[in-house]
Regions:
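Short amphipathic alpha-helix used as the core "switch/output" element in two-component signaling
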Residues: 40, 62-73
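Two-component/phosphorelay signaling modules centered on CheY-like receiver
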Residues: 13-30
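Active-site residues of response regulator receiver
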Residues: 10, 53, 81
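The feature encodes the CheY-like receiver
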Residues: 57-58, 81, 85
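C-terminal output helix
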Residues: 87, 105-114
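Acidic catalytic/metal-coordinating carboxylates
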Residues: 33-37, 60-63
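Active-site beta3 strand of CheY-like receiver
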Residues: 45-51
Length: 132
């Protein structure tokens, strides 16, 4: 059985490891700690869902979101942020983010959002399949 692919993009190893622990049983998990690595992983792995930190070194999560959506528009991106910023939320939503989740995050809430995002990608794939 092929597990759905999940990409975790965060510059903090402890966050990536925690999220990998949470999601490794139901997902094929990939990690990236930078914009360059994230873009390469999206091209290579074609994840269904990306968990993306908003604050990244040398760039911000909004720029990473832009590039992910350009490469793989069907991918659902959940932004992780320690900031409570309405302007950021609006911009992320306008660029196609599925959701914003505050740090520290509630694992149950994050799992629910990832499952909802996965359901959306599955529904989009069914719609995209040609009828025979």
């Amino acid at each position: 059985m092929n597990l759905p692919r999940l990409l975790i993009v965060d510059d903090e190893m402890s966050v990536r490891e925690s999220l990998k622990f949470v999601f490794s049983k139901g997902f094929s998990v990939f990690e990236a700690n930078s914009l360059e690595t994230a873009v390469a992983k999206v091209k290579e792995a074609r994840p269904a869902v990306v968990l993306l930190d908003v604050l990244m070194p040398r760039t911000d999560g909004i720029e990473v979101l832009r590039q992910i959506k350009a490469i793989h528009p069907g991918c659902e991106v959940i932004m992780l942020t320690a900031m409570n910023n309405r302007q950021l939320a609006a911009k992320a939503t306008d660029l196609g983010a599925f959701a914003l989740v505050g740090k520290p995050f509630d694992v149950v809430d994050l799992l629910a959002k990832v499952n909802s995002a996965l359901a959306k990608t599955a529904a989009q794939e069914k719609v995209a399949l040609p009828q025979t």
